[in-house]
Amino acid sequence: MSALVELDQVSAHFTVRGSGWFGGAKQVLRAVDAVSLAIGEGETLALVGESGSGKSTLGQMVAGLRAPTLGSLRFRGGPFATKAARRAIQLVFQDPFSALDPRMPVSSLIAEPLVIQGIGTQAERRTRAALLVEQVGLPRDSLNRYPHEFSGGQRQRIAIARALAPEPALIVADEPLSALDVSIQSQILNLLKSIQEERRLSYLFISHDLGVVNHLADRVAVLYLGKLVELAPRAELFARPSHPYTQALLDAVPRIGRARRRQVALSGEMPSPLAPPPGCVFHTRCPKAQAICRAEIPLLAPAPGRPDQLAACHFKE
């Protein structure tokens, strides 16, 4: 599988001012810290982790909304900050209620990315909007209506149609199901899968719902405190997670027919990204932590006997 987007030691750091009457010393918040991975053509790569792990910030960098502080991104082996890359990468936001301008009809909302990028004539844009609204399962008369006239699931369909308008190669989907009712989530999930099959799209799918990830992803990247701690094919990761943090995330999800093994329970809160722990960033919550974990940063390396499953742990399984 050829790489569509490559991230090489990408970091996102923010400078924040301390508290107090006169402001404290400036501190560096490491939202994403030296992450390297690739998204393949036609692949769904899922990003998972707790709130504050850096998932959305990483997604913003891939979508071109935020430049990395350190490191670099490449698009199909070439420069990332190009018009071709901007057109090829689109974003679907978490909240369909706030992602769509309430003053614009659906036809204009879907066509807006084409206007911004100078694609097609006005007539061609109208034609594409009409085709897309039907492809996402809405009637053609939706084109003249406004966002407030639709349900949450229908608005997310409109947002998906809008993202598809420039014919992208990659869609960054940031928690696209979390604001929807459970009954609607499966419909949108099936829509995303069918669109991918028809168009050979790639997805960077950001989610906290491991059940959804298990149905959609080809590979899974696990983030903790801005660090990539595990990267593996979906089936291997769900069957035999290597990193203790991944084990804990999976153990928190009830599953029928789960293989019997000692469960890993998370204790305590995630440390502040303003003051990450030395060594392995997970050692403050890890039941396997030893002296080496507090002193040395583990490298992302293959798990024993599984070359495609990478984990950053001194005691990976």
Language-model region placement:
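P-loop NTP-binding/switch modules centered on Walker-like glycine-rich loops
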Residues: 172, 176-261
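A short, proline-enriched helix->beta-strand linker immediately N-terminal to the Walker B motif
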Residues: 165-169
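Conserved ABC transporter NBD signature motif
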Residues: 71-81, 85
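Conserved ABC ATPase signature
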Residues: 146-150, 154
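Helix-to-loop junction immediately C-terminal to a conserved catalytic motif
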Residues: 63
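Short catalytic/signature loops enriched in Gly
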Residues: 3, 16-23, 28, 231-317
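Conserved ABC ATPase "signature" region
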Residues: 124-141, 194, 250-251
